[in-house]
Amino acid sequence: MRRDQAQRPIIIAAGGTGGHFFPAEALAAELKRRGRQIVLMTDARSGGLTSTVFADTDRFVLPGAGIAGRGIRRAGQAVIALGHGVVKAGALLRRLEAGCIVGFGGYPCIPPVLGARLRARNVPVILHEQNAVLGRANRLLARKIHCLALSFASTSHVPAGTRTLVTGNPVRPAIAALAGTSYTPPGTEGVINLLILGGSLGARVLSDVVPAALALLPPALRQRMRVTQQCRAEDIDRVRMAYAACGIEAILAPFFTDVATLIADAHLVIARAGASTVAELATIGRPAIMVPLPGAIDDHQTANARILVDAQGGWMIRQPDFTPDTLAARIAGLLAEPGTLADAARNAARLGMQDAVARLADTVEQSLDTARAPQGDFKGEIKS
């Protein structure tokens, strides 16, 4: 007996790095709270990301969901794996009687979406784009879906004719719980909390430059610094020694489970400009110096950082200019003007869409109600 549309599981297709996975986790938590059944389709890389939300969720690892690579041989292997992934996803979607598919970009969302077009054409597909530049997987699939949910109205590279809806970028429940936490800039005395985030894969340049920059600050400032820094496991010992050499207290780890509290406690954040980091800074409202990843596809991290900079919610230093001297001068200047930090915190908070996860969940539930309509009935814009 076939299930009613509203009782069918919602398929979340996400994996790879935290930038794709964390918004998916936030949506899953909200949909579970609403009593919906969730199934995760992902790649092998997501196994390294800690998630209590998906701990009791059916999880299917699909071949072809992590096909990045270079070279003719690798490309051929990727095409074969992708084909297997599409076939497997299509069969799973039919067996599970999926109600809706929500993809979060990156290669892990390709097999389920193409599988749906092959074997489950009546299943509505929603894609979410976290960055200010539409990712290549989402660009490839955009014309095959019911709705494209955007984090920013100004997102570029959206194909003409795509039905779009601005929902914002969902953040994890722990981040949302601290939305709009009041900010007090550091005074002339007391501890200065500095948080350095390198993304879910770490960022060696931050481990190289930040300790050297702080060592250039006057001793009176250094002795007030309390640094919490995310860095690769293999870098921890040398970074710890660098901070110890200049008398700075530092907590170092490859990954922090309490990142929401760390952001809320920070006077200043130095970070990559991944979509989740930008969304988390805006949700809580904290000033940040952004260092975009120079090799990011389509330079999307620079576009993300530009959103924050244009709103006067932070500052950007491109990696070629990210030297100890440049960073030390910027930090010293900001600490000398606490009002500037406070203004940036307020401006960052104005960017935050605190109801992003509710907006996206509403869109998903609406798709269940309109699944039989050939074009759906979303109240989004058609991109011209």
Curated annotation (Swiss-Prot):
Gene Ontology CC entries for this record: plasma membrane
Topology within the bilayer: Peripheral membrane protein
Enzyme class of the recorded protein, top EC level: transferase
Membrane-spanning residues: none
Catalysed reactions listed for this entry: di-trans,octa-cis-undecaprenyl diphospho-N-acetyl-alpha-D-muramoyl-L-alanyl-D-glutamyl-meso-2,6-diaminopimeloyl-D-alanyl-D-alanine + UDP-N-acetyl-alpha-D-glucosamine = di-trans,octa-cis-undecaprenyl diphospho-[N-acetyl-alpha-D-glucosaminyl-(1->4)]-N-acetyl-alpha-D-muramoyl-L-alanyl-D-glutamyl-meso-2,6-diaminopimeloyl-D-alanyl-D-alanine + UDP + H(+)
Superkingdom of the organism of origin: Bacteria
GO MF annotations in UniProt: UDP-N-acetyl-D-glucosamine:N-acetylmuramoyl-L-alanyl-D-glutamyl-meso-2,6-diaminopimelyl-D-alanyl-D-alanine-diphosphoundecaprenol 4-beta-N-acetylglucosaminlytransferase activity; undecaprenyldiphospho-muramoylpentapeptide beta-N-acetylglucosaminyltransferase activity
UniProt-listed Enzyme Commission number(s): 2.4.1.227
Gene3D superfamilies to which the protein is assigned, alphabetical: Glycogen Phosphorylase B
CDD domains, per the entry: GT28_MurG
Family of the protein in this entry: Belongs to the glycosyltransferase 28 family. MurG subfamily.
NCBIfam families linked to this entry: murG (TIGR01133)
Protein name as it appears in the record: UDP-N-acetylglucosamine--N-acetylmuramyl-(pentapeptide) pyrophosphoryl-undecaprenol N-acetylglucosamine transferase
Chain's gene name: murG
